[in-house]
C-alpha cells in the first residue's frame, strides 16, 4: 500500500489519523503480506503524526527516509541530462532561484536561456510559478499567514534574527512561535545556529530556502 502526499488527506474533521490507526492496528499489522509506505512533502505533519506519534501509531515506523533537495552538483547533473547547454555560472544562478527542488527544475526548457526560463515561469501572466509562493505555504502549513510573516521578516535580515527579534516583528510568542519555528526548520525553510558559549535565547534563525529568498527579492515587489 503506497499513499503519496498523505498530509493532504488529513483534512479538517476527516479523522484520518484515527482511521489509519484502526486500519493498521486492527488489521494490517497482523498480516505478513502488507507493506505500508507513506510519503508527504509536509514534513511537520509527517513527523508529528507518524514518526513522533504518541497515540495509536506510536513506534509503528520500521524506517523513515528524509528525501532532501538536490545539491548544487546534483542540479548540474540533472540539467546535463536535460541537455541544457548552460555554463556553470548559469547553473549556479538557477540553483539560487529554484534550489534543488526536482519539480521546479523539471519545468526548465533546455532550449531557452536561464533568463528566458525565469521570465516565462515566474513573471509571465500564465507562468506556472507565478502563484507558487502562496500555494506552497498554504499546502504545507495551517495558518499559513503566520509562517509567511516569519519568513518575510527573516528575508529582510540576511544576518539572521533571534527569537526575541522575530517575536517583536510578528507579535507572537510562546508555544505558537516555537511550533512555527520548529516546523519551518523541519521543512528546511530556515536554519538556526548558536555561537559557542551563547545562551539559547541568542540562537540565530536565518532564511535558507532559495525560492523564498528569490521570491522576496524579485517577485513579491513585482506582484504587489
Each PLM stretch: what is its role?
Residues 1-224:
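Phosphate-binding site recognition
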Amino acid at each position: 500500500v503506497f499513499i503519496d502526499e498523505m498530509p493532504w488527506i488529513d483534512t479538517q474533521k476527516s479523522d484520518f489519523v484515527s482511521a489509519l490507526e484502526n486500519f493498521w492496528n486492527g488489521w494490517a499489522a497482523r498480516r505478513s503480506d502488507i507493506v505500508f509506505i507513506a510519503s508527504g512533502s509536509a514534513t511537520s505533519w509527517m513527523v508529528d503524526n507518524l514518526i513522533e506519534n504518541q497515540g495509536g501509531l506510536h513506534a509503528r515506523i520500521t524506517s523513515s527516509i528524509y528525501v532532501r533537495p538536490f545539491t548544487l552538483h546534483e542540479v548540474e547533473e540533472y540539467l546535463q541530462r536535460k541537455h541544457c547547454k548552460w555554463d556553470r555560472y548559469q547553473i549556479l544562478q538557477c540553483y539560487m532561484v529554484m534550489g534543488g527542488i526536482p519539480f521546479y527544475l523539471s519545468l526548465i526548457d533546455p532550449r531557452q536561456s536561464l533568463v528566458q526560463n525565469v521570465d516565462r515561469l515566474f513573471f509571465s501572466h500564465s507562468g506556472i510559478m507565478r502563484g507558487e509562493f502562496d500555494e506552497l505555504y498554504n499546502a504545507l502549513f495551517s495558518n499559513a499567514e503566520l509562517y509567511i510573516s516569519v519568513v518575510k521578516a527573516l528575508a529582510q535580515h540576511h544576518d539572521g534574527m533571534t527569537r526575541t527579534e522575530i517575536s517583536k516583528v510578528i507579535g507572537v510568542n510562546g508555544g505558537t512561535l516555537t511550533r512555527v519555528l520548529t516546523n519551518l526548520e523541519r521543512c528546511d525553510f530556515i536554519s538556526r545556529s548558536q555561537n559557542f558559549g551563547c545562551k539559547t535565547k541568542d540562537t540565530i534563525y536565518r532564511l535558507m530556502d532559495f525560492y523564498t529568498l528569490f521570491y522576496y527579492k524579485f517577485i513579491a515587489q513585482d506582484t504587489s
